[in-house]
């Protein structure tokens, strides 16, 4: 039988996971995949993150996947971290993200537009379920903002283990600089700490330094 693109990626990820790495770094694992296959890849990553406690860092342009599956998002711009935090925090900065060439999930843009008109308030929506609860009026905004955090065990609950940031970091960058021989700085004064059990998404426009950062994280560049 012929495997789909998503199934092939799932097999490749499983082969890597069999080695039980402490940190798994992926550079656009859903490139050229359709929506269903892309979701399959991120479901696989979340299962590994939750079941094995592996810290996962993934570069991805499909921001809806990052907002749904990651518990921390980093936004790169010209080799520097422009924004970082939980998805709800990062994707609330619609104008700032647009200015540096990064999109927000569509439902988040709709929510922010409605909030600007004074029609809704609370935590920005990141997926269709949250948007439906907020916009339809089935749940009032105050309750929707609480429910948007997703209870433990729900499919959209953050996968970060409790007190993970009290644990010893698995990887730390302290004011890292990197420049290629034929160009300027690809990464500039970048500080980053990764903790056990995190699932971190990295996003940024072309040339922001995403691939360089992943190579630095994996030791392919020094």
Task: Please provide the spans of the model-predicted regions.
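Conserved ABC ATPase "signature" C-loop
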Residues: 78-79
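ABC ATPase "signature
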Residues: 84-85
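Helix-to-loop junction immediately C-terminal to a conserved catalytic motif
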Residues: 218
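The feature captures the beta-strand-to-loop junction immediately N-terminal to the Walker
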Residues: 203-205
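Conserved ABC ATPase signature
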Residues: 1-3
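Catalytic Walker B motif of ABC-type/P-loop ATPase nucleotide-binding domains
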Residues: 24-27
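Conserved catalytic motifs of ABC-family nucleotide-binding domains
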Residues: 20
